[in-house]
Amino acid sequence: MFSPDGGLPAAPFGLLPDGGPPFPRGGYDGAAAQQLFFPFASEPDGARDAATARAWLPPPAGPPAKAEARPARPCRQGSPEPRAAPPATPCCGPAWAAPPWPGPAPPAATAVPGPPFPGPAAAAFPAAPGHALCPAALQPSSGGLANLGSSGSSSGAASEGGHSSDSGDEDAPTSEELEQFAKDLKHKRIMLGFTQADVGLALGTLYGKMFSQTTICRFEALQLSFKNMCKLKPLLQRWLNEAENTDNMQEMCNAEQVLAQARKRKRRTSIETNVKGTLESFFRKCVKPSPQEISQIAEDLNLDKDVVRVWFCNRRQKGKRLLLPFGNESEGVMYDMNQSLVPPGLPIPVTSQGYSLAPSPPVYMPPFHKAEMFPPPLQPGISMNNSSH
């Protein structure tokens, strides 16, 4: 039953001894102790390799240094207790099951800290405490997608079929309608005898918004943007209706055109001849009078100061154009326009009375550039003919 040394009784090879007391509970009748462990699966003797050792699973050593990417596994709700194998004979070694302590969880099975999506969908997929959230729970239900799709399609259909909030009461015209209206406008405008400028002035007279001839021309040529043509079409349509039903539209356009030209151009100032002579005498005395002198001249001649000032400006420009400047330094001397341009350093040929002299030899001068501040000194003339004196 037990060894004389007082130790535990010997156990067969590959079996652990019983964890109970060394003496059986039934007494000292020498009955064999009952096996308290779960039975293990058996393997045939020929299939067991004695050289292959079954090692224990290592204890958990904290989180792994580098997590390996593993494919997602289906969620299983299993029991943490080891499963029991069918009864087997005690002649072979045990096949160790999973250890009772929990091992490190794979990275793909970690629980999400918050709900995957807010709203009622999160309440439809509650995460059980202590278990990882299954990947299937992260996918929205087909009913939710169908609802979203149906709502989006219904809203799109409503926006296409109905009117938008900022579209206005009437629909925007299409490109074909704008093109046809531009053709009709041009044809009726020519038939009624209006120009493009008349149309722009009439729009300003009737509706307070004037347009240029270029704008009307671009509208008829379809060269404006679609948005601008849509804005301009109602005004032109109203003008066209007024022009067809009103007889004095041409007179109204002509009056507006006259007023516009009067606003743009000032009346031309006319100065009498005797006043011009007086101004000319003042100009010979002083080319550029001061503001005080201009005021005095205007008061003497009963003219406006701006008229006198503009006359002096125009007179100075006229003198520059005709090269007839009058000033203190010129003292009324006019320049001779027919005087030959001869450099002052060269001798001027003198014609003798009664007989002719030989022509002077040609003189070649070095080129003088405009960028130079001082001209180069004159070189002595080189005669091209051998004239004896």
Swiss-Prot record:
Upregulation: Strongly down-regulated during embryonic stem cell differentiation induced either by retinoic acid treatment, or by cell adhesion prevention leading to embryoid body formation.
SMART domains referenced in this protein's UniProt entry, alphabetically: HOX (SM00389), POU (SM00352)
POU-specific domain boundaries: 170-244
Biased composition (Acidic residues): 167-177
PROSITE patterns: HOMEOBOX_1 (PS00027), HOMEOBOX_2 (PS50071), POU_1 (PS00035), POU_2 (PS00465), POU_3 (PS51179)
Region (Disordered): 1-88, 145-177
Low complexity bias spans: 1-18, 145-165
Cellular component, GO, one term: nucleus
Record localization: Nucleus
Family from the record: Belongs to the POU transcription factor family.
The name this protein goes by in its record: POU domain, class 5, transcription factor 3
Organism: Gallus gallus (Chicken)
Record lineage: Eukaryota, Metazoa, Chordata, Craniata, Vertebrata
